């Protein structure tokens, strides 16, 4: 072994394996870019993003931890969401939940 070496198993790692997903169309109706991080409660993102918020309640982006999706002004794109896991308690963000889902 070489100091600092990382030995991994063969094959790809599938993110959020076995988790239910929701795909929805999101549009930036604002005049500024909006970036949403991997673990942000999607229901509570910037109000200038137009989508079915109720479908996004308790969900986050299905992307790698520490990454983000950027929405340019006027841009529409499909995103895939997965449930927020753990205790399923939401605090902060835009303070729309502040407790258990």
Swiss-Prot record:
Keywords, ordered alphabetically: Cytoplasm, Hydrolase, Virulence
Has UniProt tagged this entry with the keyword Hydrolase?
Answer: yes
Q: Which InterPro entries match?
A: Urease_beta-like, Urease_betasu_sf, Urease_subunit
What would be one Pfam family of this protein? Urease_beta
Q: Which CDD domains match?
A: Urease_beta (cd00407)
Q: Which biological pathway?
A: Nitrogen metabolism; urea degradation; CO(2) and NH(3) from urea (urease route): step 1/1
Q: What is this protein called?
A: Urease subunit beta 1
Please tell me the species this chain comes from. Brucella abortus (strain 2308)
* Taxonomic lineage: Bacteria, Pseudomonadati, Pseudomonadota, Alphaproteobacteria, Hyphomicrobiales
What gene does the UniProt entry assign to this protein? Answer: ureB1
């Amino acid at each position: 072994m070489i100091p600092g070496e990382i030995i991994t198993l063969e094959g790809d790692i599938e993110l959020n394996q076995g988790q239910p997903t929701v795909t929805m169309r999101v549009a930036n109706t604002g005049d500024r870019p909006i970036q949403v991080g991997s673990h942000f409660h999607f229901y509570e993102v910037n109000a200038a993003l137009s989508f079915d918020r109720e479908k996004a309640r308790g969900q986050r982006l299905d992307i790698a931890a520490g990454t983000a999706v950027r929405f340019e002004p006027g841009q529409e794109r499909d995103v895939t969401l997965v449930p927020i896991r753990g205790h399923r308690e939401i605090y902060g963000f835009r303070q729309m939940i502040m407790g258990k889902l």
